[in-house]
Amino acid sequence: MMRFLILATNNQGKLQELRRLLAGTGWVVQAAPPDFAVEETGTTFAENARLKALAAAERTGEWSVGDDSGLAVDALGGAPGVYSARYGRNDGERISRLLAALAGQADRGARFICAIALAEPGRVLKEVEAECRGVILHAPRGNGGFGYDPIFLVPELDKTFAELDIVEKERHSHRGRAVRKLLSGCSRGTFIVDH
Protein backbone atom coordinates (compact mmCIF):
# COMPACT_ATOMS: atom_id res chain seq x y z
CA MET A 1 0.00 0.00 0.00
CA MET A 2 1.33 3.42 -0.95
CA ARG A 3 1.46 5.97 1.84
CA PHE A 4 1.15 9.58 0.79
CA LEU A 5 2.74 12.49 2.58
CA ILE A 6 1.64 15.95 1.47
CA LEU A 7 4.11 18.84 1.67
CA ALA A 8 2.07 21.87 2.69
CA THR A 9 3.92 24.46 0.63
CA ASN A 10 3.96 26.03 -2.79
CA ASN A 11 7.43 27.53 -2.20
CA GLN A 12 9.43 25.70 -4.87
CA GLY A 13 12.73 26.00 -3.00
CA LYS A 14 11.29 24.47 0.18
CA LEU A 15 9.43 21.87 -1.84
CA GLN A 16 12.59 20.68 -3.60
CA GLU A 17 14.57 20.57 -0.35
CA LEU A 18 11.85 18.68 1.52
CA ARG A 19 11.42 16.19 -1.33
CA ARG A 20 15.16 15.44 -1.32
CA LEU A 21 15.30 15.18 2.47
CA LEU A 22 12.32 12.79 2.59
CA ALA A 23 13.45 10.65 -0.37
CA GLY A 24 13.84 7.00 0.51
CA THR A 25 11.59 7.17 3.58
CA GLY A 26 8.93 4.91 2.10
CA TRP A 27 6.48 7.76 1.69
CA VAL A 28 5.14 8.94 -1.65
CA VAL A 29 5.88 12.63 -1.23
CA GLN A 30 3.49 14.99 -3.02
CA ALA A 31 3.03 18.73 -3.19
CA ALA A 32 -0.12 20.34 -1.87
CA PRO A 33 -2.71 21.23 -4.52
CA PRO A 34 -1.58 24.18 -6.71
CA ASP A 35 -4.18 26.52 -5.22
CA PHE A 36 -3.26 25.57 -1.63
CA ALA A 37 -2.70 28.62 0.55
CA VAL A 38 -2.77 29.21 4.29
CA GLU A 39 -2.72 32.60 5.93
CA GLU A 40 0.28 32.61 8.24
CA THR A 41 -1.36 34.15 11.30
CA GLY A 42 0.91 32.50 13.88
CA THR A 43 3.34 34.53 15.93
CA THR A 44 5.94 31.75 15.90
CA PHE A 45 7.38 29.44 13.27
CA ALA A 46 5.85 26.48 15.14
CA GLU A 47 2.34 27.98 15.04
CA ASN A 48 2.58 28.63 11.30
CA ALA A 49 3.94 25.13 10.60
CA ARG A 50 1.02 23.69 12.57
CA LEU A 51 -1.52 25.80 10.63
CA LYS A 52 -0.09 24.65 7.29
CA ALA A 53 0.10 20.95 8.22
CA LEU A 54 -3.45 20.85 9.58
CA ALA A 55 -4.88 22.74 6.60
CA ALA A 56 -3.18 20.44 4.08
CA ALA A 57 -4.28 17.33 5.99
CA GLU A 58 -7.89 18.55 6.10
CA ARG A 59 -7.83 19.46 2.42
CA THR A 60 -6.29 16.21 1.16
CA GLY A 61 -7.26 13.65 3.80
CA GLU A 62 -3.59 12.59 3.96
CA TRP A 63 -0.81 13.02 6.47
CA SER A 64 0.85 16.36 5.81
CA VAL A 65 4.05 18.15 6.69
CA GLY A 66 3.96 21.89 7.32
CA ASP A 67 7.20 23.85 7.39
CA ASP A 68 7.68 27.41 8.49
CA SER A 69 11.12 28.83 8.55
CA GLY A 70 12.95 32.07 8.38
CA LEU A 71 15.83 34.22 9.42
CA ALA A 72 16.20 35.81 12.86
CA VAL A 73 18.89 38.50 13.02
CA ASP A 74 20.30 39.30 16.46
CA ALA A 75 20.85 43.04 15.90
CA LEU A 76 17.28 43.39 14.61
CA GLY A 77 15.67 41.79 17.66
CA GLY A 78 14.96 38.58 15.75
CA ALA A 79 13.53 40.26 12.65
CA PRO A 80 12.55 39.49 10.00
CA GLY A 81 11.52 36.28 11.83
CA VAL A 82 8.08 34.94 10.88
CA TYR A 83 7.89 37.75 8.32
CA SER A 84 11.00 36.56 6.43
CA ALA A 85 9.08 35.66 3.26
CA ARG A 86 7.10 38.91 3.41
CA TYR A 87 10.10 41.19 4.01
CA GLY A 88 10.02 42.14 0.33
CA ARG A 89 8.41 41.14 -2.97
CA ASN A 90 11.23 38.81 -4.05
CA ASP A 91 14.54 37.40 -2.83
CA GLY A 92 16.57 40.33 -4.17
CA GLU A 93 14.37 42.91 -2.49
CA ARG A 94 14.36 40.99 0.80
CA ILE A 95 18.16 40.75 0.79
CA SER A 96 18.57 44.45 -0.07
CA ARG A 97 16.19 45.49 2.69
CA LEU A 98 17.97 43.31 5.25
CA LEU A 99 21.41 44.59 4.27
CA ALA A 100 20.15 48.19 4.51
CA ALA A 101 18.73 47.49 7.98
CA LEU A 102 22.13 46.14 9.06
CA ALA A 103 24.19 49.00 7.61
CA GLY A 104 26.72 50.08 10.23
CA GLN A 105 25.91 47.16 12.54
CA ALA A 106 28.91 45.33 14.00
CA ASP A 107 26.79 42.44 15.33
CA ARG A 108 25.75 40.46 12.27
CA GLY A 109 24.89 37.23 14.08
CA ALA A 110 21.78 35.43 12.87
CA ARG A 111 20.07 32.09 12.83
CA PHE A 112 17.88 30.28 10.39
CA ILE A 113 15.02 28.56 12.20
CA CYS A 114 12.83 25.77 10.84
CA ALA A 115 9.70 24.41 12.51
CA ILE A 116 8.03 21.33 11.05
CA ALA A 117 4.66 19.88 12.02
CA LEU A 118 3.28 16.51 10.93
CA ALA A 119 -0.51 16.28 10.95
CA GLU A 120 -3.36 14.03 9.99
CA PRO A 121 -6.87 15.43 9.51
CA GLY A 122 -7.89 16.98 12.83
CA ARG A 123 -4.68 16.66 14.84
CA VAL A 124 -0.98 17.37 14.95
CA LEU A 125 1.06 14.20 15.36
CA LYS A 126 4.58 15.51 15.81
CA GLU A 127 6.38 18.86 15.95
CA VAL A 128 10.09 19.62 15.74
CA GLU A 129 12.25 22.72 15.49
CA ALA A 130 15.90 23.22 14.56
CA GLU A 131 18.22 26.09 13.82
CA CYS A 132 21.53 26.95 12.23
CA ARG A 133 23.66 29.86 13.48
CA GLY A 134 25.59 32.07 11.14
CA VAL A 135 26.60 35.57 10.16
CA ILE A 136 25.02 37.99 7.69
CA LEU A 137 27.54 39.15 5.08
CA HIS A 138 27.71 42.67 3.67
CA ALA A 139 27.07 41.42 0.12
CA PRO A 140 25.71 38.23 -1.49
CA ARG A 141 28.06 35.33 -2.30
CA GLY A 142 27.26 32.21 -4.31
CA ASN A 143 24.70 31.17 -6.88
CA GLY A 144 22.85 28.28 -5.26
CA GLY A 145 19.97 28.03 -2.85
CA PHE A 146 17.15 30.53 -2.48
CA GLY A 147 15.92 33.24 -0.15
CA TYR A 148 18.58 34.65 2.15
CA ASP A 149 21.10 31.87 1.33
CA PRO A 150 23.60 34.17 -0.49
CA ILE A 151 24.14 36.39 2.57
CA PHE A 152 24.04 33.73 5.32
CA LEU A 153 27.58 32.60 6.13
CA VAL A 154 28.18 29.38 8.06
CA PRO A 155 31.39 30.34 9.94
CA GLU A 156 32.77 26.83 10.45
CA LEU A 157 32.56 26.23 6.68
CA ASP A 158 33.44 29.79 5.61
CA LYS A 159 30.72 29.47 2.98
CA THR A 160 27.26 30.86 2.49
CA PHE A 161 24.33 28.51 2.03
CA ALA A 162 24.37 29.63 -1.62
CA GLU A 163 27.96 28.34 -1.97
CA LEU A 164 27.25 24.89 -0.54
CA ASP A 165 26.40 21.91 -2.69
CA ILE A 166 23.08 20.23 -1.99
CA VAL A 167 24.55 17.53 0.26
CA GLU A 168 26.50 20.05 2.36
CA LYS A 169 23.52 22.36 2.69
CA GLU A 170 21.21 19.57 3.78
CA ARG A 171 23.78 18.42 6.35
CA HIS A 172 24.14 21.86 7.93
CA SER A 173 20.86 23.65 7.29
CA HIS A 174 18.04 24.31 9.74
CA ARG A 175 15.64 22.42 7.47
CA GLY A 176 17.93 19.40 7.16
CA ARG A 177 18.31 19.28 10.93
CA ALA A 178 14.55 19.60 11.48
CA VAL A 179 13.75 16.81 9.00
CA ARG A 180 16.29 14.53 10.68
CA LYS A 181 14.57 15.23 14.03
CA LEU A 182 11.19 14.49 12.44
CA LEU A 183 12.47 11.19 11.07
CA SER A 184 14.33 10.11 14.23
CA GLY A 185 12.91 6.87 15.54
CA CYS A 186 11.07 6.21 12.30
CA SER A 187 11.07 3.11 10.22
CA ARG A 188 10.29 3.00 6.51
CA GLY A 189 6.91 4.60 5.79
CA THR A 190 6.10 5.28 9.45
CA PHE A 191 6.61 8.05 11.98
CA ILE A 192 6.82 7.83 15.75
CA VAL A 193 4.22 10.37 16.81
CA ASP A 194 4.25 12.56 19.92
CA HIS A 195 0.57 12.40 20.87
From Swiss-Prot:
UniProt cofactor(s): Mg(2+)
GO cellular component: cytoplasm; cytosol
Residues binding substrate, per UniProt: 9-14, 69, 146-149, 169, 174-175
GO BP, sorted A to Z: nucleoside triphosphate catabolic process; nucleotide metabolic process; purine nucleoside triphosphate catabolic process
Origin: domain of life: Bacteria
GO molecular function: dITP diphosphatase activity; ITP diphosphatase activity; metal ion binding; nucleoside triphosphate diphosphatase activity; nucleotide binding; ribonucleoside triphosphate phosphatase activity; XTP diphosphatase activity
Keywords, sorted A to Z: Hydrolase, Magnesium, Metal-binding, Nucleotide metabolism, Nucleotide-binding
Cofactor note: Binds 1 Mg(2+) ion per subunit.
CDD domains noted in UniProt: HAM1 (cd00515)
Binding locations of Mg(2+): 39, 68
Catalytic residues (positions): 68 (proton acceptor)
NCBIfam families, per database record: RdgB/HAM1 family non-canonical purine NTP pyrophosphatase (TIGR00042)
Function, in words: Pyrophosphatase that catalyzes the hydrolysis of nucleoside triphosphates to their monophosphate derivatives, with a high preference for the non-canonical purine nucleotides XTP (xanthosine triphosphate), dITP (deoxyinosine triphosphate) and ITP. Seems to function as a house-cleaning enzyme that removes non-canonical purine nucleotides from the nucleotide pool, thus preventing their incorporation into DNA/RNA and avoiding chromosomal lesions.
Protein name: dITP/XTP pyrophosphatase
Organism encoding this protein: Gloeobacter violaceus (strain ATCC 29082 / PCC 7421)
